[in-house]
Amino acid sequence: MTDYRAGFVSFVGRPNVGKSTLTNALVGEKIAITSSKPQTTRRAIRGIMHRREGQLILVDTPGVHRPRTLLGERLNTLVESTLGDVDVIGFCVPADERIGPGDRFINERLDDYPRAKKVAIVTKIDSARKTQVAEQLLAVSALREWEAIVPVSAVNSIQLDTLTTELMRLLPVSPGPLYPDESVTDEGVEDRIAEYIREAVLDGVEDELPHSLAVTIDDLVERDDKDLLEIYANLFVERDSQKAIVIGKGGSRIREVGATAREPIEALLGRHVFLSIRVKVAKDWQRDPKQLGRLGF
């Protein structure tokens, strides 16, 4: 009988190289929000894959970058602490972008984690020509000795089984699974709701605004008179001008955000919800240790 394997794999890379999309595709459920905006991921989010031969716990981390705020510093620290605990590191680079200084910086930092086995993942091959993919595979292979190099498309489900097989074989032998069979993530319900709201706000906002957004959940209230869950959320920005952008003319933008967020929230909970979002200003919260703490960072 083949040994059962279980362990942790972390995907790392620059912001916006497809780490969260890949995590969701492998798990088969949306457990990490996605956006074209860099630094969408702000926590180490675990997605759990169950296979007959083992269990893969995928840890999606924030993109590594040069921090400009205290929040940025804390996100980089989170990545570093996560990488010290995992069994395999999957270094993600997109097929349609040449390897640059940011990629090389992250690759060099991988030497700080000798315990973890290293796999290179060339993402977004659906967005690149075959010649581009071939060139990127050669460029990646020149960076270091990898346990494996796998080109994938999370969007089109290309080579995901191959990637899973390669990751699984690198995990340690385990007497059994580390998480129950029904688990797909260890994220709490309130955290997932807050993330779905933030994802809805990210769609269509200007580049500087995404970093200024944070969402907390005040309360979940069961209605006695009908099968409805009331959700009361706070959406924080850093300036009054940002508050006006998020709310929109006559509240049009925030209503749109609520309607967009309700869909995945109702799918998650399997029921109808009433969603109330209050927009508040927390001045320069990304640079304020006390406010960062209150917002969960």
Curated annotation (Swiss-Prot):
Localization of this protein: Cytoplasm; Cell membrane
G5 as annotated region, ranges: 152-154
Record region (G1): 13-20
Annotated region described as G4, given as residue ranges: 123-126
Chain residues that bind GTP: 13-20, 60-64, 123-126
InterPro entries cross-referenced by the UniProt entry: G_ERA_dom (IPR030388), GTP-bd (IPR006073), GTPase_Era-like (IPR005662), KH_dom-like_a/b (IPR015946), KH_dom_type_2 (IPR004044), KH_sf_prok-type (IPR009019), P-loop_NTPase (IPR027417), Small_GTP-bd (IPR005225)
First-listed, main subcellular location of the protein, grouped into a coarse class: cytoplasm
Record bears the keyword Transferase: no
All copies of domain KH type-2, residue ranges: 205-283
Any one cellular-component term (Gene Ontology): plasma membrane
Similarity-based family: Belongs to the TRAFAC class TrmE-Era-EngA-EngB-Septin-like GTPase superfamily. Era GTPase family.
Function as written in the Swiss-Prot or TrEMBL entry: An essential GTPase that binds both GDP and GTP, with rapid nucleotide exchange. Plays a role in 16S rRNA processing and 30S ribosomal subunit biogenesis and possibly also in cell cycle regulation and energy metabolism.
UniProt name for this protein: GTPase Era
